[in-house]
């Protein structure tokens, strides 16, 4: 019988697209630290020897963008010329415009307030920064309620970075990728890890044998629980044979090109909007966080084994145009009642999300590598499960 396999990938903080994400979010954090009401849409391109920062920003803060860019690159580990990219001497170009006044007006004065339909509710005043659809997801495959393939992929990449930064493996360089294939049983429960792929940038002098031995013994076997590994698990370590040239010298990087790595590894649907470089009035980011918060609390409350949440917005309108809950038949109550409970327990207007999750803070750079969801190494407000009792109470009182 054909195996039921599912694969997800992660990339390291030194991957060129992730370098761009971290620069964009470092700039966002610097703005929010000085002016919590900053409106930021910051994009970054990185390529050999050069960084280009552009976008639309409206803020009362002054931020030395070039300094933020260089410090971010150096912190990642691109700190010497032989890596092909060096934060000390790369060119940094900046082209920032103000946010469109048309968009700003729609965000600051929602349709509800313009049509006097807000009942003087201050949380009605902010409209969504754009139209769009966003998804959130949670599943009981891991303690952090994430799909197992993406969870393991992120953990592998964090482990590789740790071994590089603490100098256990002096020959590691910043760029790396991991991919994990998990076999599932007929009920959709994980059985074992079928294949692990790790491609990691290294110095030229290290042998393929040493790389393989280190990745298997110090990374894979330290990260993946033994119950998921057996004699049939396949390990593919630097399968291209050589990975010395990497980072922005090997490939150009651009903000927002790793949206599946950032979320659920393809296990759940994605609305298409990227996160990094966007302030929380952009629902691409804040509503995706809220959707994860909703889904995680539903699963944590024992109301479903898995849950996918879709939210949708119209530009300049405060209230979501739609809310959808899909538990794929695993819910203990029907999805319509769960949707009703969500409407009553969670405030999913942009200003409501910002208040509920306290999003006008400089907390975003830490999300720009190794995933925005299921993080156990940093404290993120949308990962809290503090709404479980409110959901259970609503269900109990309305069944």
Swiss-Prot record:
Obligatory cofactor(s): Mg(2+); K(+)
Keyword hit for Nucleotide-binding: yes
GO molecular function, one term: magnesium ion binding
GO cellular component: cytoplasm
Primary location class: cytoplasm
Regions annotated as coiled coil: none
Region (Flexible loop), start-end ranges: 99-109
Cofactor note: Binds 2 divalent ions per subunit. Binds 1 potassium ion per subunit.
EC number annotated for this UniProt entry: 2.5.1.6
Pathway note: Amino-acid biosynthesis; S-adenosyl-L-methionine biosynthesis; S-adenosyl-L-methionine from L-methionine: step 1/1
Keywords: ATP-binding, Cytoplasm, Magnesium, Metal-binding, Nucleotide-binding, One-carbon metabolism, Potassium, Transferase
Domain of life: Bacteria
Record-listed K(+) binding positions: 43
Reactions accelerated catalytically: L-methionine + ATP + H2O = S-adenosyl-L-methionine + phosphate + diphosphate
Function summary: Catalyzes the formation of S-adenosylmethionine (AdoMet) from methionine and ATP. The overall synthetic reaction is composed of two sequential steps, AdoMet formation and the subsequent tripolyphosphate hydrolysis which occurs prior to release of AdoMet from the enzyme.
Family: Belongs to the AdoMet synthase family.
Protein's name according to its UniProt entry: S-adenosylmethionine synthase
Taxonomic lineage: Bacteria, Bacillati, Bacillota, Bacilli, Lactobacillales
Underlying gene: metK
């Amino acid at each position: 019988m054909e195996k039921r396999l599912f694969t997800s990938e992660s990339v390291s903080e030194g991957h060129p697209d992730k370098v761009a994400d971290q620069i964009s979010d470092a700039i966002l954090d610097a703005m929010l630290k000085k002016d919590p009401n900053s409106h930021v849409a910051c994009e970054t391109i990185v390529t050999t020897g050069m960084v280009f920062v552009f976008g639309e920003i409206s803020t009362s803060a002054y931020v030395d963008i070039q300094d933020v860019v260089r410090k971010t690159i150096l912190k990642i580990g691109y700190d010497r010329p032989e890596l092909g990219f060096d934060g000390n001497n790369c060119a940094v170009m900046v082209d920032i415009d103000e946010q469109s006044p048309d968009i700003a007006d729609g965000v600051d004065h929602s349709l509800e307030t313009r049509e006097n339909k807000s009942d003087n509710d201050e949380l009605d005043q902010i409209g969504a920064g754009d139209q769009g659809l966003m998804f959130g997801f949670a599943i009981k495959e891991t303690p952090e309620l994430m799909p197992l393939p993406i969870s393991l992929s992120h953990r592998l990449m964090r482990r590789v970075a740790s071994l590089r930064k603490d100098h256990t493996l002096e020959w590691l360089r910043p760029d790396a990728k991991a991919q994990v294939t998990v076999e599932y049983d007929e009920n959709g429960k994980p059985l074992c890890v079928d294949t692990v792929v790790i491609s990691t940038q290294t110095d030229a002098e290290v042998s393929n044998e040493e790389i393989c031995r280190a990745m298997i013994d110090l990374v894979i076997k330290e990260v993946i629980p033994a119950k998921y590994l057996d004699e049939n698990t396949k390990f593919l370590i630097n399968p291209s044979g050589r990975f010395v040239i990497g980072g922005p010298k090997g490939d150009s990087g651009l903000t927002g090109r790793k949206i599946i790595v950032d979320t659920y590894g393809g296990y759940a649907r994605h609305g298409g909007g990227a996160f990094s470089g966007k302030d929380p009035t952009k629902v691409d980011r804040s509503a995706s966080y809220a959707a994860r918060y909703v889904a995680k609390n539903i699963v944590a409350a024992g109301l479903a084994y898995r849950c996918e949440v879709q939210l949708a917005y119209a530009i300049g309108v405060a209230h979501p145009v739609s809310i959808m809950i899909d538990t794929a038949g695993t819910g203990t109550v029907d999805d319509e009642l769960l949707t009703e409970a969500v409407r009553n327990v969670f405030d999913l207007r942009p200003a409501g999300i910002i208040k509920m999750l306290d999003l006008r803070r400089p907390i975003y750079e830490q999300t720009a590598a190794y995933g925005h969801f299921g993080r156990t190494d940093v404290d993120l407000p949308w990962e809290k499960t503090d709404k479980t009792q409110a959901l259970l109470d609503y269900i109990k009182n309305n069944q």
